[in-house]
Amino acid sequence: FISVSLPREIVNIKKMLQSTIHSKGAEIKWVRDGNMHLSLKFIGHTPETSVDDLNETLKSVTEEFSTISLSIVGSGCFPRRERARTLWVGISGEIDKLDDFVDAINGRLEPLGFPIQERKFIPHVTLARIKYPQKHTPDVTQFLGTTFAELPMKISRINLMSSQLFSKGAVYTILGTHFLVSKA
């Protein structure tokens, strides 16, 4: 997958929001602190032979964009409050520029065999996942109603990541880092 690293302070936001969920036996899997990120594109299983082409392509895209200013703001869930499966924090700021950047990544990777995602890109940071069926549905009302000071961040680089799933969770490895051109 292609992602953006987050400011360290995201951990404080996650901990504060964790305290708002009264799970009463519900199973909620919180993303480990070091694994939180902003996903730009999921590319799925990729042969090692494609990594160089991916990195070369991502480098060419990042060279066409300057730093993107964003903020982490607000909380939400997918698909709906009554049966939330994903708990997240949102992104605001230069969203049009971010959308253009993601579109450019998609457009350049499609000829390499990585299809454009059909779902509209909704920038967010996943904090937790809830699997069903389970005996207790967590009440996410307070999570969704909690406000916090927005956390500014800049996208100045992106990472091509690999993800390996283990019983204790995913382990991410950086396969390439690509820098956006700095603002003068």
Question: Positions of the model-derived regions?
Answer:
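Histidine-dependent nucleotide/RNA phosphoesterase domain, centered on the 2H-phosphoesterase fold
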Residues: 1-184
